[in-house]
Amino acid sequence: MRITRLSASVALLFGAALFAACGDDHAPTQPTSDTQLEAARAATEKYQDLSRALADGYVEAKIVMQQMGHHYLNASLLDDKFEPDKPEILVYAPENGRMKLVAVEYAVPLDKSASAPDGFAGSADAWSANTKYGLWTLHAWLYQDNPAGVFNATNQRIQLDPGTLEGMRVDPMVH
């Protein structure tokens, strides 16, 4: 009987120690690109209505690129920081008579960062140095599936009708 109590006490102490070792770890977790993309989508969902983007300071840059779309820039967001929930540029494409949000684009001035900014977690994102506009840029195709990948600069599914480009500067350069 004494051995049974001793064994039970040892088992109880061992179990308590094991339980304590498995307790909640309150160390912050590193974001993943999926959680960052979800944050970007949550923050920009409202901009599916172009009038909301305009009200929040995005202005048409009058730069249109085939396989990208119409770019709307919020210059007040241009800085040396990458913030997934604050894209500097929204990209729209005409669809059924209205402008559809297809992607967000991040931009960091080249003069504020000598190398590509740290962006989404992992290595899937690929920033481009666009010397014509003086920006590091990165697209995230959140609202239009892109067969080439969410971070690819262009999207073959975006084919703009030349009739919609009147008054725009059509820029064939891919950034």
What are these regions (language model features)?
Residues 23-25:
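Bacterial signal peptide processing site
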Residues 18-21:
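C-terminal motif of bacterial Sec signal peptides marking the signal peptidase cleavage site
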Residues 1-10:
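Bacterial N-terminal signal peptides that target proteins for export
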Residues 27-175:
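Primary mode marks residue(s) on the alpha4-beta5-alpha5 output face of response regulator receiver
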